[in-house]
């Protein structure tokens, strides 16, 4: 197959503002057909740092146009990559002359999804694929394949798997689950498009985020798979349910900026304005997922009504992960359990259970073994503290749990388990009283006890240091000098 690497010069088929034209890596407006499916391979064009939509897709075009809102108000600021890295117009707080714009010493250049796919995919090298699993052969070794045989094990080590796959855990694991659940055959999916879709998802996670990155997405997807295997769900879910659940799990934190919703609101971030300060991040994750679904053309062979239904239901799943709405979903779930009227043959009830399953998967870190849970705790705390450092630097007021000088990992985790994790997983165990549910609750108890032990040690150490300092101050000057 011959590929033209030169960008075609096409006339603009709509008025485009000058600030968009001047933006490097902005939207590619094209009159040609979709990227895949062009009758002439020379019509393929490289993505220029953003999503390239067909000119007729007004909704998708609008979604990506939103990314240019920042350009109008931040002249002179150079973005490191596209996406939702939070931008604050600090001229509100300081004059332009007082701002010091620091440039990262590490120049991170995002390899565009099609570009990376073009270089690495076996399909573009003309290699025939006779089995759906053969697509995995070039990407990870026998150890990773061996791990995938135990992908339904709750002790699955996603950190080890990510190392074995050279940082491609989300692509490798999700593709395997699509094959394992028979989704490729059932929905007649083009493996090339599926592969490209998963690569784009993985790339749109920010690897520099300590916690909200592609590894977290892979971990949540693996947990979701475990829940789908539970008897009550396994006997009732349809292939459609499984498809939506896996896509929602893989994309539930897509393009996460590494800061929380209150940060975006108090800095007047354009996403907060767009979504009216309501489930800001979750709405953005959902809309980003919709953009990639449309760009990849993975389900272009399905009827329009089915595609629209898919987008809506994926949105409902992702929006359920908004931690600020935990009590709302938990109360509804608990009331159904109290009445005993959950009927999994009812699509609405089944969808509620899938929402609760994704919520559990999203915050299941304390339910893992101590070795895994501790790593996740350290990573999420690092991300919290990084946000707190930014807030201190620009005098924004440090958000709760984000001050590294007053908070500790132990305190944060104990509170998280007590007020969020235990109530959620207790109700999940009422719904699905299985060995896995009891194992998860058991891990929560053990991990909480471990953090309390570390908390006591830290408190004892601080008391000892304080006493030593006090004694040193009380000693006569000559004794201290001697």
UniProtKB/Swiss-Prot annotation:
Keywords: cAMP, Cytoplasm, Hydrolase, Metal-binding, Phosphoprotein. Gene3D superfamilies: 3'5'-cyclic nucleotide phosphodiesterase, catalytic domain. Its cofactor is a divalent metal cation. CDD domains: HDc. Its EC number is 3.1.4.53. Pfam families: PDEase_I (PF00233). It catalyses: 3',5'-cyclic AMP + H2O = AMP + H(+). The keyword Transport does not apply. Residues 136-458 form the PDEase domain. A divalent metal cation 2 binds at residue 253. Insensitive to all selective PDE inhibitors. Pathway: Purine metabolism; 3',5'-cyclic AMP degradation; AMP from 3',5'-cyclic AMP: step 1/1. Coiled coil: none annotated. The active site is at residue 212. It is an enzyme of class 3 (hydrolase). Interacts with CBFA2T3. Hydrolyzes the second messenger cAMP, which is a key regulator of many important physiological processes. May have a role in muscle signal transduction. This is High affinity 3',5'-cyclic-AMP phosphodiesterase 7A. It comes from Homo sapiens (Human). The lineage of its organism: Eukaryota, Metazoa, Chordata, Craniata, Vertebrata. The gene is PDE7A.
